[in-house]
Structure formats: C-alpha cells, structure tokens
Amino acid sequence: MKLWDVVAVCLVLLHTASAFPLPAGKRPPEAPAEDRSLGRRRAPFALSSDSNMPEDYPDQFDDVMDFIQATIKRLKRSPDKQMAVLPRRERNRQAAAANPENSRGKGRRGQRGKNRGCVLTAIHLNVTDLGLGYETKEELIFRYCSGSCDAAETTYDKILKNLSRNRRLVSDKVGQACCRPIAFDDDLSFLDDNLVYHILRKHSAKRCGCI
C-alpha cells in the first residue's frame, strides 16, 4: 500500500471511532419529567462541557490511534524491503527497463538461435513489382512460404540424405523436403494502365507445408 492509501484508511477508522455511541455505563441518566424544561435551557452548557471531556469517548479511539502510529512506523521501514517482496517476473521487468540494451541483445540472440520452421510470411507490394509484365497501380498483399523443413524430416528423408552423403546414390538426384504452399489465396482481378482486365490465379500462398 502506498502512504496516501494508508493515511486515507486511518482517517476513515478515526472518523468511525469518533462516531461510535458512548458506552452504556457512561451515558448520562435521564432527568425527571419536571426537570426537563430546565435541562433544555442548560443544554448548550452541557454540550460544551461534555465536548471537552476526552474520557467520554469509547475505548476504541485509543486502539485506532495506536494502529495509526504503528502503521506509520511500519511504512517508514518498509520501502527498503518492498523490492524483496516483488515477484521474480516483476523484478526481471524492472531490470530489463533499466538495461534496455542488454535485453534487446538477448532477444535478438534468442530469435536467431530458434528454428522458425516452415511459416507463412506476408509483404505489401504493387502488382507491377511481381515482374509479370503488368503496368498498373493495383496493390496486393503477397504471401509466401519461408523457413526450414529440418524438423519435418522423416526417417526416410534421413536415410536418403545419408546415402547421398556417402555417395551410394550417385546416379540419382535425391530431392529434399521444401517449404512450399499447400493452399493458395483467391484469384486477384485488376485493371492495368491500359484498362485491360486481368486475373491472377495461384499467385499468393495461403498455407505452407514441407513437401
């Protein structure tokens, strides 16, 4: 808890304790019927005299004051210990924020060392950039397959690779698993700069796999 939160809680407790009714043993006895008229006239003086008597407050007031003092003392000692109570994830996050260069370096090394496998990658291009001879301002999202298929190798693929390495299959060319599209996007329709209508089929990958 922050200091202001604790102070607010203490003020609420103090207000609650001051609002408690007086104990039964400390309530003033009721005046007889004939003296009520006189009691009404003396009421302002009685209230002023009672307000100056701290012994009429309930015993909980002293407990609340002790609690407030103990809480303030604890807060003065606690800032140095708050770091030890934080979870490990929070401490690591604070350390990374203090040393951004170190955290970036570790993240880059981790990405380089991790094998992504065969994944689908997207890039924003103009249809003219595809190199198919179209002159147009039409744009598209081109998706292609990239990555390694080493993790998808079967025992058959390993045997063929070993036989090729040992030159046991010299006369035959053995193909390896490649990361290629196994499904394609919908056809793309567009007009070129000469207002000629064209349709591109199987132009962009939709799903990838090792084949």
Swiss-Prot record:
Keyword list, A-Z: Cleavage on pair of basic residues, Disease variant, Disulfide bond, Glycoprotein, Growth factor, Hirschsprung disease, Secreted, Signal
Top-level taxonomy: Eukaryota, Metazoa, Chordata, Craniata, Vertebrata
Protein's recorded name: Glial cell line-derived neurotrophic factor
One GO process term, biological-process aspect: glial cell-derived neurotrophic factor receptor signaling pathway
Induction (UniProt): By cAMP, 12-O-tetradecanoylphorbol-13-acetate (TPA) and FGF2.
SMART domains named in the record: TGFB
Entry GO terms, CC: extracellular region; extracellular space; Golgi apparatus
Gene this protein is translated from: GDNF
Assembly and binders: Homodimer; disulfide-linked. Interacts with GFRA1 coreceptor and RET: forms a 2:2:2 ternary complex composed of GDNF ligand, GFRA1 and RET receptor. Interacts (via propeptide) with SORL1 (via N-terminal ectodomain); this interaction affects GDNF-regulated, but not constitutive secretion. Also interacts with SORL1 in complex with GFRA1; this interaction leads to GDNF endocytosis and lysosomal degradation.
Region (Disordered): 21-56, 78-113
